[in-house]
Amino acid sequence: MAEICCEEAMSPPATATAAVAAAVSASAAAAVSSAIDRRRRRMEMRRIRIASDLELQAGEDGRPGKRQRLARTASGAPRPDEDSASERPSCGRTEEFPRYGVTAVCGRRREMEDAVSIRPDFLPASGKFHFYGVFDGHGCSHVATTCQDRMHEIVAEEHNKGASGEVAPWRDVMEKSFARMDGEVGNRASTRSDDEPACPCEQQTPSRRDHAGSTAVVAVVSPTQVVVANAGDSRAVISRAGVPVALSVDHKPDRPDELERIEAAGGRVIYWDGARVLGVLAMSRAIGDGYLKPYVTSEPEVTVTERTDDDECLILASDGLWDVVTNEMACEVVRACFHNNGPPAPAARPSGVPSSAEAAETENGGAASVKGISKAESSDKACSDAAMLLTKLALARRSADNVSVVVVDLRRGL
């Protein structure tokens, strides 16, 4: 005990140093505590201000906390969707951009013969009508790309042909549009300008120009309806309250009604690596394929489906997906992506896409050519994730064809 007391008495500098260190530590702790308190007060004041702002923004329906939904003018600039018309700019109508995602890949094929067309607001004078199309070419890609460039224009022209300003029924519109599209493809050689390069298939074998064709599944989505026209084995499926509903039926040569039609026209269905028209084509309806007419027809089957609050999504895809993925599985994948991404934000117009969506950069290569949007862009992350995941699923399941997928969000009130 004496030694300890003596040592403490003989080392006053150490005691002073310890005291200074303790004082500094206490001062630092007090400073940190003070900073935390100030930050806590700032956060509390910020929460109070946000709560006050949200109460002021609450609508007459008494739902505080709802953020104002963003709308977009024709110029693409976002702004709040106020109810007062006087506060809206007089130039440019208000439009809510559709939510969609698209993915298209060559897959295990040597060449890319798929084409995708997305044309938001393709009927500007008739309200919010959005055009989506998937075209799966065979023999060559020129028929699919021609459909990609022209189908929406033909549909718009036929839609506006009603007498005395009346709108023609959608069934008639689609049937006439597909017939016109088929005629344009058949007359391609005579209508092609000298400056336009010839298709590779024409350069190699000019006499086989009519040996190419394409499927066509087209959807026109309005606020109240989904109109689908299909020729071939591409498919449209809608998910409604968790249940997949096919809006088109594949045109296979061995489908009983198609087999009867082909045989009535004098043709035959030969089983050569599956059922094929004259042993050649594995589908019974398509755009083009002039050498197989009248057995292969371009007449589409058209469905007009009324939209409901239970509708979740619309999926358009080539048979590269549907050959290996069921309707149920595809809808489950999309719903999972929607769930993981939460409620959708207002869709953003992809850069460079005007409201008429008539011009876009076209690129060749491994990915499909997508007109109306840049092939790398979608307007909604959840839809884009779903389209990408479905494509990867098809490739993982050894799909042997090009794979093109379009996913459209149909949910309301979000």
Swiss-Prot record:
Disulfide bonds: none annotated. Its EC number is 3.1.3.16. Its cofactor is Mg(2+); Mn(2+). One of its GO terms (cellular component) is membrane. InterPro entries: PP2C (IPR015655), PP2C_BS (IPR000222), PPM-type-like_dom_sf (IPR036457), PPM-type_phosphatase-like_dom (IPR001932). Residues 56-95, 186-212, 345-372 are annotated as: Disordered. The chain crosses the membrane at residues 15-37. Residues 355-369 have a biased composition (Low complexity). One of its GO terms (biological process) is regulation of intracellular signal transduction. Mn(2+) 2 binds at residues 136, 319, 401. GO terms for molecular function: metal ion binding; protein serine/threonine phosphatase activity. Residues 99-410 form the PPM-type phosphatase domain. It is a single-pass membrane protein. PROSITE patterns: PPM_1, PPM_2. Belongs to the PP2C family. This is Probable protein phosphatase 2C 9.
